[in-house]
């Protein structure tokens, strides 16, 4: 890259980041500095990727942290000589854009594209080493045509199906939510509305077909945070157990199946509990019981977001325990879920705390069948006994260890036809149907004669209609657009209708990382050869909030498309970094529960509410408008420069921890960059003039330089960016203290090395000072320096002197001293003479580099 036409003949001590950053960003763009190099057989690759943003319209500090971290990693590996792919795109479909467009009375497409344009310009202010030629948005037709294509690939593989089911309905956003999009309080992850149940015909993906592989392959992800793997493990929720069939006493042909991981407690079953929608409900004839069940249904619906009472309704139904033929009463219970297992559970109050509490409340028998010790007698329990032990009250299994009895009772059940070994998962198939406009249309035609018919690739894309009606505070759903919906069946040719559901936005983000290596490919979603070269992503960076949704779906997509022979990779992301939140001080009035804007507070060191003079609590919380603690990245960049913002973000906290914003810390990084600027300005004035040369100073600088190279390299590889900057500061101090006392060759080498080490963190100022000291090509085209291990060796070491095993003195020893010289030196020391004088020295033991022990 050619240096800009500028002569550094007159220098200023003023560091002007705005001028420097604009200049270099323009030059980098003009020279295609960050265009991805083609991979060859001999080149190493590195694929660095941030989770792509939703184009909300404005960059926030959480974005800045995410993209600066990824950029640092990408730059480092480019310096290491690798071909780096570092792209950017936009997760552009979804309800927020649709709702924002409705509020403004414009098309979601227009709104989204405006936001993308603005956010792109904001991102470019950060000086990211992104290959912008590969940019796309998921709402682009030339992207979502391939989302539709991949949907059809999964359809052909039998992984897509449609069924009528009770779904999670968001009454505010008027759409269906996947289980993963409903929080623990039963509220929508997006709108916060209490989720309702509704019966609709929906499209699903069979993610459960991959449950076992998704679980097992977590073991391969050595470079993922353990907490993310645990979250996925728990969400998949594998249980190994037994399905046990209980016959109804009034109808022996009718079975009630329960899943249990504790067949050893089968003799202790004193009731069965079923859900309010279980198929056995039809056998209940008592009208009072039926009404109680209806009331319980309403209670469950109204209290979806609350902790449920353990409500039970005893029915007239009786089951028969298959192992001992005892009659077992059947209850309808509030805690039994329709969607998990069989919708029925066996109640063992003596050995399950939930069952124990339910039994106590409803006066159900409690029968203990496991004891801690064979000689122990049963007493009335005050809580469930849940430990291992020995069976009792269990016929031929009495006194058998319960861990063995589990297997034996299961075997008896399987042999006699009333049990089946079963693996069960908490994971449910992925519901992808959404009843809104702004999403990827599903490429299916509904025909009265042929049913649901998938389109051919040649008939794609099914494009969203542009003639939309924005009225009555909503955009009409696709089903209301007669011009768009009416079509002909691709199979039989009669009049038919397009599918009116759109896809969950996670469909688009489950494969976007596969598009970047061949983003301009026009006849398929990606080039197989490019996927096999570039994937998996070497470093993926994003928030832990995506641990279950996006990351699990992306893993599923990768495995499903692999099985369709579209590529050979098993996992999409080799290394995952989940960065913490960016927090800032928020001022809360605990009396009113309201937050107060810092601009309304007279004294931030002693904050009080200007309205009622109440002392305010200072909390560090995630930045948000409602808490008045948001920091605008553009204003920070305007005041201090992008390099300062980058340095602060990287230095303030380890990347996986939450970061607390502090103006003082930002100013500290700005001052550090100013000191660097002044040092290089002064050096540039007489870069070729001879300096005084002091060997001790030179040796010290060489050592500092090599320590910096070694430590910063290791810190970046280990995502310890804050300690890397600390090492950079140490090297700067050594450089500044000795720069005028070393020979010219070392001076230039040290200045050059510091510049390269600084460049991934603060790329603009590094580029500027690189050219200040006379280099013509970009610093970002240099190679990362290697450290010299010899330079790190000490000339001397501290030797501990012992007399009869007790420490009596310490002395500095040169590395080149012989054992005889060491003995002579230590024996002459006053502190040693007083312990050895007039005594016989029997033996001297030397552990080289550590200890000398004189035995007297």
Curated annotation (Swiss-Prot):
It is found in: Cytoplasm. CDD domains: Anticodon_Ia_Leu_BEm, LeuRS_core. Its main location: cytoplasm. It comes from Prochlorococcus marinus (strain MIT 9215). GO terms for biological process: leucyl-tRNA aminoacylation. The gene is leuS. This is Leucine--tRNA ligase. GO terms for cellular component: cytosol. A motif ('KMSKS' region) lies at residues 622-626. It catalyses: tRNA(Leu) + L-leucine + ATP = L-leucyl-tRNA(Leu) + AMP + diphosphate. Belongs to the class-I aminoacyl-tRNA synthetase family. A motif ('HIGH' region) lies at residues 53-63. NCBIfam families: leuS_bact.
């Amino acid at each position: 890259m050619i240096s800009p036409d500028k002569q550094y003949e007159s220098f200023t001590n003023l560091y002007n980041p705005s001028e420097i950053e604009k200049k270099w960003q323009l030059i980098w763009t003009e020279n295609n500095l960050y265009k991805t190099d083609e991979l060859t057989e001999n080149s190493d690759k590195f694929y660095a990727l941030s989770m792509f943003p939703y184009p909300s319209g404005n960059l926030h500090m959480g974005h800045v942290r995410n993209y600066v971290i990824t950029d640092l990693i990408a730059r480092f590996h480019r310096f290491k000589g690798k071909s780096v792919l570092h792209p950017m795109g936009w997760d552009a479909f979804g309800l927020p854009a649709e709702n924002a467009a409705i509020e403004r009375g414009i098309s979601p497409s227009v709104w989204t594209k405006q936001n993308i344009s603005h956010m792109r310009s904001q991102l470019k202010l950060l000086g990211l080493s992104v290959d912008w030629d590969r940019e796309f948005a998921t709402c682009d037709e030339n992207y979502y045509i391939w989302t539709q294509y991949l949907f059809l690939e999964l359809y052909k593989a039998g992984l897509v199906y449609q069924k009528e089911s009770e779904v999670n309905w968001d009454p505010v956003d008027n759409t269906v939510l996947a289980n993963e999009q409903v929080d623990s309080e039963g509220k929508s992850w997006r709108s916060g509305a209490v989720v309702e149940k509704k019966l609709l015909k929906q499209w699903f993906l069979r993610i459960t077909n991959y449950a076992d592989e998704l679980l097992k392959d977590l073991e391969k992800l050595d470079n993922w945070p353990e907490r993310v793997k645990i979250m996925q493990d728990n969400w998949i929720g594998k249980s190994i157990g037994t399905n046990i069939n209980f016959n109804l006493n009034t109808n022996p042909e009718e079975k009630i199946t329960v899943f249990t991981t504790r067949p050893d407690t089968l003799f202790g079953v004193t009731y069965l509990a079923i859900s309010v929608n279980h198929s056995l409900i039809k056998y209940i004839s008592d009208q009072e019981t039926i009404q109680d069940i209806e009331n319980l249904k309403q209670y469950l619906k109204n209290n979806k977001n609350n902790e449920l009472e353990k409500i039970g309704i005893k029915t007239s139904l009786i089951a028969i325990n298959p192992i001992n033929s005892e009659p077992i009463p059947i209850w309808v219970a509030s805690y039994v879920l329709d969607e998990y297992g069989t919708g029925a559970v066996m109640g063992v109050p003596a050995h399950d705390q939930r069952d124990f509490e339910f039994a106590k409340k409803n006066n159900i028998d409690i029968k203990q069948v496991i004891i801690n010790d064979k000689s122990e007698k049963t007493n009335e329990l005050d809580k469930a006994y849940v430990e291992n032990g020995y069976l009792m009250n269990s016929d031929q299994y009495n006194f058998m260890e319960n861990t063995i009895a589990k297997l034996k009772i299961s075997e008896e059940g399987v042999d006699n036809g009333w049990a089946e070994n079963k693996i069960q998962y908490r994971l449910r198939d992925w519901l992808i149907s959404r009843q809104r406009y702004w999403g990827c249309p599903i490429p299916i035609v509904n025909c009265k004669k042929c049913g649901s018919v998938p389109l051919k690739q040649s008939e794609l894309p099914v494009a969203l209609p542009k003639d939309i009606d924005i009225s009555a505070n909503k955009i009409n759903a696709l089903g209301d657009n007669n011009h768009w919906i009416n079509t002909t069946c691709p199979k039989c040719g009669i009049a038919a209708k397009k599918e009116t559901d759109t896809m969950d936005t996670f469909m688009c983000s489950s494969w976007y990382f596969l598009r970047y290596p061949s983003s301009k490919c026009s006849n398929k979603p990606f080039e197989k050869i490019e996927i096999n070269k570039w994937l998996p992503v070497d470093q993926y960076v994003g928030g832990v909030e995506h641990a279950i949704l996006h990351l699990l779906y992306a893993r599923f997509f990768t495995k499903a498309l692999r099985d369709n022979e579209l590529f050979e990779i098993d996992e999409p992301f080799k290394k995952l970094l989940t960065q913490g939140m960016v927090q800032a001080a928020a001022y809360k009035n605990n009396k009113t529960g309201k937050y107060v804007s810092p601009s309304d507070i007279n004294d931030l060191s002693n904050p009080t509410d200007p309205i009622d003079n109440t002392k305010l609590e200072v909390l560090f919380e995630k930045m948000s408008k409602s808490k008045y603690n948001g920091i605008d990245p553009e204003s920070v960049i305007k005041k201090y420069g992008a390099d300062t913002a980058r340095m602060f973000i990287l230095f303030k906290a380890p990347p996986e921890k939450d970061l607390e914003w502090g103006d003082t810390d930002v100013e500290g990084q700005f001052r550090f960059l100013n000191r660097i600027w002044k040092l290089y300005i002064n050096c540039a004035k007489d870069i070729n003039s001879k300096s005084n040369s002091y060997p001790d100073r030179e040796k010290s600088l060489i050592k500092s330089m090599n320590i910096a190279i070694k430590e910063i390299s290791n810190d970046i590889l280990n995502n310890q960016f804050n300690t890397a900057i600390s090492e950079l500061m140490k090297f700067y101090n050594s450089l500044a203290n000795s720069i005028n006392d070393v020979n010219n060759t070392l001076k230039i080498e040290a200045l050059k090395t510091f510049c390269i080490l600084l460049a991934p963190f603060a790329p603009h100022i590094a580029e500027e000072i690189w050219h200040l000291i006379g280099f013509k090509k970009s610093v970002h085209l240099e190679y990362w320096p290697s450290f010299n291990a010899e330079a790190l060796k000490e000339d001397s070491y501290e030797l501990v002197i012992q007399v009869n095993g007790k420490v009596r003195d310490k002395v500095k020893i040169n590395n080149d001293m012989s054992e005889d010289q060491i003995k002579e030196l230590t024996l002459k020391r006053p502190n040693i003479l007083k312990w050895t004088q007039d005594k016989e020295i029997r033996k001297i033991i030397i552990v080289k580099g550590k200890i000398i022990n004189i035995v007297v």
